[in-house]
From Swiss-Prot:
Known catalytic reactions: 4-CDP-2-C-methyl-D-erythritol 2-phosphate = 2-C-methyl-D-erythritol 2,4-cyclic diphosphate + CMP
Organism field: Cellvibrio japonicus (strain Ueda107)
Pathway(s) served: Isoprenoid biosynthesis; isopentenyl diphosphate biosynthesis via DXP pathway; isopentenyl diphosphate from 1-deoxy-D-xylulose 5-phosphate: step 4/6
Protein name: 2-C-methyl-D-erythritol 2,4-cyclodiphosphate synthase
Molecular-function annotations in GO: 2-C-methyl-D-erythritol 2,4-cyclodiphosphate synthase activity; metal ion binding
Amino acid sequence: MSMRIGQGYDVHAFGEGEKIVIGGVVIPHHHGLVAHSDGDVLLHALCDALLGAVALGDIGKHFPDTDMQYRNADSRSLLRMVYAKVSQHGWKLANADMTIVAQAPRMASYIPHMVEVIASDLQSSASQINVKATTSERLGFTGREEGIACYAVVLLESR
């Protein structure tokens, strides 16, 4: 059995708004995220990891922010399209591990729902998906509450 690993990263700054979307879950917050799409840093990092594992470039190549059809796009839809491409190339998810870096808002209570959403969109079980959140101990742009970052790693296996 062949295996491939992919890594992804995304970041968005806080801006106007009263909610953010992370892992496909709406989270109330005193800021929104500045983005062309819905700004879901977790799903964007996951898309990059999946695309990278299959050597298909990155999310910007497939869904450029210069293309108005992706304006305010639902990142869950983008994730499903990315996973369809991965599947068409003969790969399936073995596991995915993601880390959200944010001083605020607190993510712990939303993580179980994020796992369910991602597992559903990737046609996998929740046991294949791990989401965790951490702070940067008030250091850097996330520590100053200027934005949110996310890292993602995936392992794919041949179908």
